[in-house]
Design a protein with these regions (language model features):
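Polysaccharide-binding surfaces and accessory modules of carbohydrate-active proteins
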Residues: 5-7, 11-19, 23, 33-264, ...
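Carbohydrate-binding surface patches
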Residues: 20, 243, 644-687
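Conserved, mostly hydrophobic/aromatic
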Residues: 20, 165, 289, 335, ...
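Glycine-rich, aromatic-flanked loop segments that form ligand/cofactor-binding clefts
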Residues: 71-116, 243-258, 301-325, 362-367, ...
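Short Pro-Gly-centered flexible turn/kink motifs
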Residues: 102-107, 284-303, 720-727
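Aromatic-lined carbohydrate-binding/catalytic grooves of carbohydrate-active enzymes
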Residues: 326-463, 476
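Active-site neighborhood of glycoside hydrolase catalytic domains
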Residues: 393-395, 427-429, 433-590, 602, ...
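C-terminal beta-sandwich/jelly-roll accessory domains of carbohydrate-active enzymes
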Residues: 671-729
Length: 729
């Protein structure tokens, strides 16, 4: 069994084992649940690591009497509270009926279950019953009837753990939750560095690594979504940690709304990481006999560097978070009309793009923003999900039939969560928009938010979208979300419960997505929020791929996709070849380089193919053929980062098949210099004894490629593409 429990008169010891890790905690003689160990596999009781120093201004547990060395302020706690002597970051906070806010959680019982728990209404890692176990540890406040159940999901073969928390009010008066984190991890004395992934619109998930300093560091979003600006993931690592060496802990929040990751480096040089819902946008009235479930955190530990950490997250998210028909299969090569036409199109213009795309081998045409309502710019029409027949004279069905006659499938864009003030929907239901009575709402992109916590809004959107999907043979939906959320208010809740809206909004989005993906299992849903503004594991539970960024510049995409790869699989990355000069940067890169970068994702085109030269069109045909040849390797192979594009003169990555018989190395050399020395790069993950051959007949042993490396091609011009394919005999 992956979970072992040893009970004595004085304590209960919990040990969770995966293939290469051990996680251990103990309910001690006072019922305090202490964290003992998370790291490489070890045997025995790790309680000997507990230190009980006598530290001034660190108060002592009442039951400890004269034992001045027992302090919640210095001990490693499994789920930290506030108001009872631990002055570090709490994981949970609540206000009781009498106005007090102390919580003193003590151990009550445990339960071990076969299989992996699920969370009603929320995304969660899933597994077959024989692939996982669940540990539940029940804690209870000493003075009230608040009960907390810590849930641990264990996937031993994947070396992955999950955590979530259920909070139940067993009393007779409401309790107000003001913080309910999903994850709390205390790490022992030592030097630690923090990796997080910051950014902005059109430049998401830039890797940043800094030493922990005394005090509190934070990455978070209060935008109602996980945001472009910080990603709901974090890594703590030792200073010597590299891709292949050193210790590191990683955590990913399966949630698409506002979040907070806080890390405190305390007076004892211990680190505490707390991850969960952002408390600034959370206040939940927990009624008697009601239960609140937090979202889930997925986490792991590696003692062999960041590469192993990433491989575990990528595999788990690809195979145990993403769902449905498109979970593992290669995605269709698509052409999106957005950067080719923006709002200015009609059926003739769209068909002209489709005809050329079909001739070159593209699988699917996606019609982006502007096909519905009164939508000639971004000032109107959102919410009116009916076809604009001034643009599409024969309606959507006629266009889809014509596209299908070309041998292509058809996809369509929606922005369901938004409403324009200049729309029939707003004129009929202004009360459905999120806005505060008596205040002018903040507009963003000239649009407001629909209140997705409202079941009537969910039903309206479900009917609109399902009517469109049923009206024609549609194979793909791009689900966009183009603003941050402000002006939080809903008429559905009383004043003292308005703090529930941000979380209820996300639950509403999930409920609508669950209904639609269940009703249309053959449709590929792609998430989007102005690119990568909601690129998180929670959204991947419903949409197996997400548009990675609105920045389609090939050079900058290497940086964005590099940061994305630390947690997310390549199969989840929406990535296209776009026009040059690039619409975001003005940069000109070769079409071969743009294709290589886009192949490290779903692959497609976002331009007017009719405007390409004959030479470029021939390149497109070859690129599509190449992607279809390598698609399974790219989406299901093991991904290796072979450079850091923020530091190196090139971006390089590799895909290695599970049986290690096939390797694809791709990337770009950023700059070319006269008499330039060629770069030599070592590969990883190969069969050391196998002989690998390229298409031109060159042969190398695996250990040669991994130790001596391979020379990159001689570059000619900046942003020079690299693509090398090796197959073992």
């Amino acid at each position: 069994m992956a979970i072992q429990v040893v009970t004595t008169e004085q304590s209960t010891l919990f040990t969770i084992r995966t293939k290469h890790t051990t996680y251990q905690m103990k309910a001690d003689e006072y019922g305090v649940l202490l964290h003992l160990w998370y790291g490489a596999s070890v045997e025995g009781d790790m309680s000997y690591l507990l230190d009980y120093p006598d530290v001034g201004f660190s108060g002592n547990l009442y039951e400890a009497e004269n034992r001045r060395t027992y302090s919640l302020n210095t001990l490693p706690l499994e789920y930290a509270t506030e108001g009872v002597g631990d002055f570090r970051i709490p994981a949970i906070a609540a206000t009781h009926a009498d106005g007090s806010n102390a919580l003193d959680l003590r151990y009550q019982s445990y339960n071990i279950l076969k299989g992996k728990y699920a969370i009603a209404g929320l995304p969660a890692v899933y597994a077959d019953e024989d692939e996982a176990e669940t540990l539940e540890i029940v804690l209870k406040d000493t003075a009230t009837d608040l009960q907390v159940t810590l849930r641990y999901g264990v996937l031993p073969e994947l070396d992955m753990l999950t955590r979530c928390v259920s909070i139940q009010n067993l009393g007779t008066t409401p309790i107000t939750l003001t913080k309910a984190a999903s994850f709390c991890l205390d790490l022992p004395y030592g030097k630690w560095e923090w990796m997080h992934f910051h950014g902005r619109h059109a430049m998401e998930r830039i890797t940043e690594r800094t030493p922990l300093i005394h005090g509190i560091q934070e990455s978070s979003s209060t935008r109602g979504t996980s945001s472009h600006h910080q990603n709901p993931t974090a890594i703590l690592c030792t200073p010597d940690c590299t891709e292949t060496n050193g210790s590191c802990f990683g955590a990913a929040f399966l949630y698409s709304g506002s979040f907070q990751t806080k890390i405190e480096y305390d007076q004892m040089r211990q680190a505490r990481m707390v991850m969960g819902l952002h408390p600034d946008l959370f206040r939940w009235e927990l009624q008697p006999n009601a239960t609140f479930d937090t979202p889930e955190v997925l986490f792991t530990y590696s003692d062999s560097g960041l590469e192993t950490l990433s491989h575990r997250f990528q595999k788990t998210i690809r195979e145990h978070v993403c769902r449905g028909k498109y979970q593992k299969i290669e995605r269709p090569v698509l052409i999106n009309n957005w950067e080719a036409t923006y709002f200015d199109f009609n059926e003739e213009k769209i068909l002209k793009i489709a005809e050329e795309a079909a001739r070159l081998g593209v699988d699917m045409l996606v019609l982006d923003d502007g096909w519905f309502g009164k939508r000639d710019d971004d000032c109107s029409g959102l919410g009116d999900w009916f076809v604009n027949e001034q643009k599409l004279k024969g309606g959507l069905g006629t266009l889809v039939q014509k596209v299908k006659a070309l041998g292509m499938r058809f996809g369509i864009w929606f922005e369901p969560e938004m409403i324009s003030e200049d729309s029939d929907l707003y004129r009929t239901h202004p009360d459905w928009a999120i806005q505060i009575p008596g205040r002018n709402p903040m507009r963003s992109r000239y649009q407001l938010l629909l209140d997705l916590s409202n079941p009537d809004v969910q039903d309206y959107l479900y009917k609109c979208i399902s009517d469109i999907l049923n009206s024609a043979d549609i194979s793909y939906v791009k689900w966009d979300m183009n603003r941050s959320i402000s002006d939080w208010y809903t008429a559905l809740l009383p004043a003292n419960r308005q703090g529930e809206l941000p979380h209820r909004y996300v639950l509403g989005v999930y409920a609508l997505l669950e209904r639609l993906t269940s009703a249309f299992p053959e449709v590929l849903f792609e998430g989007c929020s102005g690119g990568g503004g909601r690129f998180d594991a929670g959204m991947l539970y419903y949409c197996p791929q997400i548009w990675c960024s609105d920045d389609t510049d090939a050079y900058e995409r290497t940086i964005i996709q590099y940061g994305t790869s630390f947690f997310y699989p390549v199969s989840a990355v929406g990535s296209h070849v776009s026009v040059v000069p690039n619409h975001q940067t003005g940069r000109v890169t070769p079409i071969e380089t743009r294709a290589v970068t886009a192949m490290a994702g779903s692959f497609g085109y976002e331009l007017d193919l009719n405007l390409l030269s004959d030479e470029e069109k021939e390149a497109v045909t070859q690129q599509i053929q190449q992607f279809k040849e390598y698609g399974s390797l790219i989406h299901n192979g093991t991904y290796y980062r072979l450079s850091n594009p923020l530091e190196d003169a090139y971006a390089l990555w590799a895909f290695v098949s599970e049986d290690k018989k096939e390797v694809l190395v791709q990337g770009m050399i950023f700059r070319t210099e006269a008499n330039m020395v060629r770069h030599c790069v070592s590969l990883r993950g190969l069969d050391a004894k196998a002989v690998y051959r390229t298409k031109d007949g060159a042969a190398y042993t695996g250990d040669t490629l991994m130790h001596a490396g391979v020379l990159l091609p001689k570059s000619w011009g900046d942003y020079y593409p690299v693509s090398m394919h090796f197959v073992s005999e």
